[in-house]
């Protein structure tokens, strides 16, 4: 029995979900998301709730049960409230700015790092050392943040680099004489 999959997903006001030809579509005030459904699970929309159940007792079907339910819940929250993550930049001279549809970062390299902002993502820089990534697709917001962090991950000696807000960096002591 899936402890995640057995709970129905409640639909907030203004969110509608339709299932057509194995594709689940969620529409809300912030936009629309689509997701192909696995043939191993059955998805039913009724009474303002989405219920996911496995089609058989196989292990793969039970795995997809909880995964599908979690993905549907993420889509519902995305089209109703959206997702946002904040990155912090630490380091002397390290900064970021949005120029047109690109994010330009100075991260201590001999060149600027230019990151084209993907469709469906909004990036803002309130301060030169802070990057806010917003969107309706939780997976895409997390992926963009991971790609930005990968340009210069925080190093353990001084903590310089790009990190998530609130992320604890494991620090090391420098060498001793």
From Swiss-Prot:
Gene Ontology MF, one: structural constituent of ribosome
Pfam annotation, one family: Ribosomal_L6
Metal-binding found in the keyword field: no
Gene Ontology CC annotation, any one: cytosolic large ribosomal subunit
Swiss-Prot/TrEMBL keywords: Ribonucleoprotein, Ribosomal protein, RNA-binding, rRNA-binding
Record carries keyword RNA-binding: yes
GO BP terms: cytoplasmic translation
Organism superkingdom: Bacteria
Subunit structure: Part of the 50S ribosomal subunit.
Record family assignment: Belongs to the universal ribosomal protein uL6 family.
Function: This protein binds to the 23S rRNA, and is important in its secondary structure. It is located near the subunit interface in the base of the L7/L12 stalk, and near the tRNA binding site of the peptidyltransferase center.
Name recorded for this polypeptide: Large ribosomal subunit protein uL6
